[in-house]
Amino acid sequence: MRYDPSLIEKKWQEFWKEHKSFEADEASDKPKYYVLDMFPYPSGAGLHVGHLIGYTATDIVARYKRAKGYAVLHPMGWDSFGLPAEQYAVRTGTHPRETTQKNIENFRKQLSAMGFSYDEGREFATSDPDYYRWTQKLFLFLYEKGLAYMADMAVNYCPELGTVLSNEEVENGLSVEGGYPVERRMLRQWILRITAYSDQLLEGLEDLDWPENVKQLQRNWIGKSEGALVRFEVNNERFLEVFTTRPDTIGGVSFLVVAPEHPEVNRLISENQREAVESYIRAAQSKSERDRISETKVKTGVFTGTYAKHPVTGADIPIWISDYVILGYGSGVVMGVPAHDERDREFAEAFSLPIYEVLDKDECCIHSNHGDFLLDGLAGQEARDYVIAYLQKKNLGEAKVAYKLRDWLFSRQRYWGEPIPIIHFEDGTCRPLEDDELPLLPPEIQDYRPEGFGQGPLAKVKEWVDIHDTKTNRRGRRETHTMPQWAGSCWYYLRFCDAHNSQAPWSNENERYWMPVDLYIGGAEHAVLHLLYSRFWHRVFYEAGMVSTAEPFKKLINQGLVLATSYRIPGKGYVYPEDAREDNGVWMSASGEELEVRQEKMSKSKLNGVDPQILIDEFGADALRMYAMFSGPLDKNKLWSNQGVSGCRRFLNRFYEMATSASVQDVDDPKGMALAHRLVHRVGEDIEKMSLNTIPSSFMEFINEFVKLDIYPRSALAMVVQALAPIAPHISEELWTVLGYAPGIDAAGWPKVDPKYLEDTSVTFVIQVNGKLRARLDMDKATSKEDVLSLAREAVAKYLEGKEVKKEVFVPNRLVNFVL
């Protein structure tokens, strides 16, 4: 029989759909397993094979766990709010809803062609009103808990995108989305109080089965520091508070530096310095935060004209303003200790400020005593504790813990996002919408461009913004900012537990059954974005008794990048692979220009993405799935090769021919059964360990041995087909029925391995002549003594030729020695 994946794969995909083969059942008395992908943003580019690595891995696990008797929840949905659809709408006038739906249909078609075993009945998009009704409701819950608030703050503003960006959405002064310049501006924003959960978010990491590098990234982002809050008196009327992790260096303070955005700045400026300071602040506001704190940046600053009093010596300390100090961390004021801090030293040297050595080479305090302040000779924690106690006694300081983590800037000046369900009144009060007013839908508009600085496109729709509030009988204005793309992905994993609930975002019963997510797979780029935000929301829900687990994702795996060859004309851009040709070892473009050839992350922008449908049409989805795993360890970067897919197709051809040959018979062959049992055992172990890249090799080794049999035992082949089903499900379903079993291989379960077949039945005999090693022979333990001796004679025949063997020494399973 001929293997034709185009017919087989379509046939079984229709069978699965018709029989709802992958529908999850929370009413089951089975143990549960929840396996989830980080759901994709449905872009216009569609999926390339790099996206399929993680999806294939989760599908293998889902199919395996079903076969092992678990109730499996394996859903897929769409993170469908986002900036690209809105930018496309600005260029073309096409409503983001239309392009998003078109893209979703394309993604759905691509995923379906791969044979992924999703519970399609639970699919949703974050831009569905039935979904974001609950996103809005959950935002209002945060608001009622005091965790959502409005404040004027310095923000990252991108003029090109026309919106504010969070710190996590800016990299090297450019927007992550599009790479456009970002400026700092003051703007009234909605903010989520994630800092209230700093300690819980840190502590929760300890028990998670996550990659250590991801946990460390989150620890660093939260940035817990223990130190002291020190008060410096200014003009005998107010204090500047400084957080420092090194209070033991207080004797070396020679200046203070204040962030340009600090609320006290205006009061600190002397009149003769006002013009210079205000000019400096304007310049600082145009810079991104990352530019300001760059270690390579030359330190700049301006003197305020004002002095603070040193809390120990009473000396006058000049107060400067510099953009290397950021308001959000600590107190927004730095005490300059240039002898023992590199940034402070650079600043002091730039402005000829004094430098006082107060620590020796052993970090022991020196030159710090003053009156009853006796710090010299102390070191480390003892010195820090002494300073804190001294300052506390004088009401000039105390111990304090600070965090780098800042509250989450939540609002965006966009159209294609969840409207924030708040009405503002003229007296400065506001009202959250009630349940019967949700979902709050955005108006239909024609112009998707932002309405000037700080105003999103919604601000232009006056009939939607300016309303008579029937609940209060007052005139009001709707909030015109929208939520960020992260809002919908903060809780989508919970909605999958109860996707059709019209009364609540999820039911307690379903949540208790399915949560937490047992296996979560996605890209490492989400380490301090989605993963931190969703942990924050989940922790709030947990403390409110809305969910049963403190953490949402039990085990996390970050799939590695998929690399492919890219071709680039230096200074101009990338060209398609089909437009590149090699000429005497030099790659040239179709226009005759020399190309730079690299192995880079597969992406649309680099023109090196591979459309999976092309490979499916040529080799079949099962071959593509198999190579997606064979290409390398799941969590490592890997170089893509279409030839590798071809190799997996050849293996499947061979396997199909073997399983459908006349040699398949109902016989009991111990060797064939041993090969099958060992393979099933090895594949099961590899899936449990997520060593998925070794599985294809195991099948290839199996077939090389199995074809040596004269007769292929049907029961052994059936076991192997069951083991192949998670990796190559279409061909496995087909061969399962060819072997005489009822359709629906998942329902047949995972084959039971008999331990007796796992024993090593082969043994290596050492063959000696007069005690000297002459050969080694591998053979089955069950081989008779007579056969072993016969084979041994053949192996060393040249050493025995023409000589008399006086004695044959035989040690079972170990040695044969011919004594001449």
UniProtKB/Swiss-Prot annotation:
GO CC annotation: cytosol
Listed SUPFAM superfamilies: Anticodon-binding domain of a subclass of class I aminoacyl-tRNA synthetases, Nucleotidylyl transferase, ValRS/IleRS/LeuRS editing domain
Catalysis performed (reactions): tRNA(Leu) + L-leucine + ATP = L-leucyl-tRNA(Leu) + AMP + diphosphate
GO molecular function, one term: leucine-tRNA ligase activity
GO BP term (any one): leucyl-tRNA aminoacylation
Location in the cell: Cytoplasm
PROSITE patterns found in the cross-reference section: AA_TRNA_LIGASE_I
Alphabetical list of InterPro entries matching this protein: aa-tRNA-synth_I_CS (IPR001412), aa-tRNA-synth_Ia (IPR002300), Leu-tRNA-ligase (IPR002302), Leu_tRNA-synth_edit (IPR025709), M/V/L/I-tRNA-synth_anticd-bd (IPR013155), Methionyl/Leucyl_tRNA_Synth (IPR015413), Rossmann-like_a/b/a_fold (IPR014729), tRNAsynth_Ia_anticodon-bd (IPR009080)
Catalytic EC class: ligase
Binding site for ATP: 604
Enzyme Commission number(s) from the entry: 6.1.1.4
Family: Belongs to the class-I aminoacyl-tRNA synthetase family.
Full protein name: Leucine--tRNA ligase
Source species: Chlamydia caviae (strain ATCC VR-813 / DSM 19441 / 03DC25 / GPIC)
Gene name for this UniProt entry: leuS
